[in-house]
Amino acid sequence: FRVDISTASCTGFFNMHTQDWDDEILKLTGITRSQLPEIVDGTTKETGLTPAAKQATGLDDETPFVYGAFDGALSNLGVGATRQDTVAITIGTSAAVRVATDHPVVDPEQRLFCYSIDRQRWVVGGPLNNGGDVFQWAANHLVDSSAAKSEDKSVYDVANEVIASVPAGAHGLLF
């Protein structure tokens, strides 16, 4: 049983400096390494299906499966925010502001998180647990609701149309 390094780094059991399970935390919790998955790179591929999985999916035994990474790490990669001078902001139910770095960063006040993207890069950022509420507020206060209603559209549809009309990278912003 295995887990990719980025997901492992989100568990609270991971030592970001050794990029392995943290011995002190394991000792404190009474958890052994054998109870935890092996940590692998997100690009690790495996093949092989159980007979039941093969029958249910119709996939060939040699179909490769890649471990991947957690969504926050991949969002930085997806928008090209892989350097320290580029920030990724993602908004969904929750939201986060993240920047990639070539070394782990520890916030002594524990305001920021730091997770591994892979063995050479980390993502440092701050979470917001109400990203959807922020979008709702912006749509309800910045979109002309009368105009939206006259076009038989919701304020959210209009907000998304405005966002979609801005070319990617306009003034350095990717949305």
Residue ranges and their predicted role:
Residues F1-V3, T7-A8, G12-G30, K45-T47, ...:
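Active-site core segments that coordinate phosphate-bearing ligands/cofactors
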Residues G30-D41:
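A conserved helix-loop-beta module that forms one wall/lid of the active-site cleft
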